[in-house]
Amino acid sequence: MQELRLLCLVVLVGLAQACPEPCECGEKYGFHIADCAYRDLQAVPSGFPANVTTLSLSANQLPSLPGGAFREVPRLQSLWLAHNEIRSVAAGALASLSQLKSLDLSHNLISDFAWSDLHSLSALQLLKMDSNELTFIPRDAFRSLRALRSLQLNHNRLHTLAEGTFAPLTALSHLQINDNPFDCTCGIVWFKTWALTTAVSIPEQDNITCTSPHVLKGTRLNRLLPLPCSAPSVQLTYQPSQDGAELRPGFVLALHCDVDGQPAPQLHWHIQTPGGTVEITSPNVGADGRALPGVLAASSRPRFQAFANGSLLIPDFGKLEEGTYSCLATNELGSAESSVNVALATPGEGGEDALGRRFQGKAAEGKVCYTVDNEVQPSGPEDNVVIIYLSRARGPEAAATAEGVPGKQPPGLLLLGQSLLFLFLASF
């Protein structure tokens, strides 16, 4: 018995000797505890014994948590960091703590948080992040926290929540999320429905209120009236040349993205050409086709002209403009996308066959396209191909500018029969 006591004393002395200044280390109820609270620390100390299971750094002056801050203590089960001055938690600061069960980051100034670190904390049961400056939580932030029972997010600056944020938390029994400045728009409607039907305890619901829009300020979320909301939908139409039409230099291709949704979706164009990828947040030009103030362009008329009504014009369409044109619409409820492949071919040179081979991204699945009466007939929903034929009979001619009165075809651009260059612009 005396030998056992001596062994325990040696272990405790060794633990105490390994404890960094000015912390105190010891064992209590089978837990190896390192107490560094109220020490005016401005950085996480180093030199902890590897078997520490509880670490308290509360009530210090820590400004941030750098990557690898707790690499020395991989067996931590409880980490207390409340009442510091932490503004940022870097990627890798917490990722090594796979055995962590309790994490308290409350009463700090955190606005920059490495949410991906939570993916490694599958044993976590308590997460306190209340009283910080958080403005956003990624949809997949809690995807690995299936053991989490209590989550505190109250008194932050959260304006909205992505639908499904709490779905992975199958063990959750307590959620505190009051006193956040929620925008009571379509993006928050799902949370109202979830909060009214879930078995999770959500205290202080009288303080889960709207901050905006102004007419709803102060309204309790659980009393919010139904809102007219719908996810985006898109329909992409185009006005290419008729098969065999004679094209002159300066040909303009017109695409139109018809967008629907509530709230009104934001339109974005994604263009993949042989020269690279082009991203355009619509619009980038005014009604006259000239670049809007603040838009970076090589000239006053951008190569790709995105108008506010959903039309996209490509002046001087040529081989460099071949590729895939996609319009994407996004609002608070989701996104939708539609694409079309556009290519040039020269009659008599096997152009159609070559283009067919070029855009067989789904050929292995039996999804190909063919043209009938100048309309694309896709046999698969993803693959639309517009084939534009160039004439070899004429020499180069000067391209006309794209200006003109809507409803009248600018001269010298394209022989389209009854088709009008500004068909799309004039229709809206």
Curated annotation (Swiss-Prot):
Residue spans crossing the bilayer: none
Glycosylation positions in this chain: 51, 309
InterPro entries named in the record: Cys-rich_flank_reg_C, Ig-like_dom, Ig-like_dom_sf, Ig-like_fold, Ig_I-set, Ig_sub2, Leu-rich_rpt, Leu-rich_rpt_typical-subtyp
Cysteines engaged in disulfide bonds, as pairs: 257-327
LRR repeat spans: 51-72, 75-96, 99-122, 123-144, 147-168
Secretion signal, residue range per the UniProt entry: 1-18
Keyword annotations of the record: Disulfide bond, Glycoprotein, Immunoglobulin domain, Leucine-rich repeat, Repeat, Secreted, Signal
Domain LRRCT: 180-231
Main localization, broad class: secreted
A GO CC term attached to the entry: extracellular region
All residue ranges annotated as the LRRNT domain in the record: 19-50
Gene3D superfamilies: Immunoglobulins, Ribonuclease Inhibitor
PANTHER family referenced in this protein's UniProt entry, alphabetically: KEKKON 5, ISOFORM A, SYNAPTIC ADHESION-LIKE MOLECULE SALM
Name the UniProt record assigns to this protein: Immunoglobulin superfamily containing leucine-rich repeat protein
Phylogenetic placement of the source organism: Eukaryota, Metazoa, Chordata, Craniata, Vertebrata
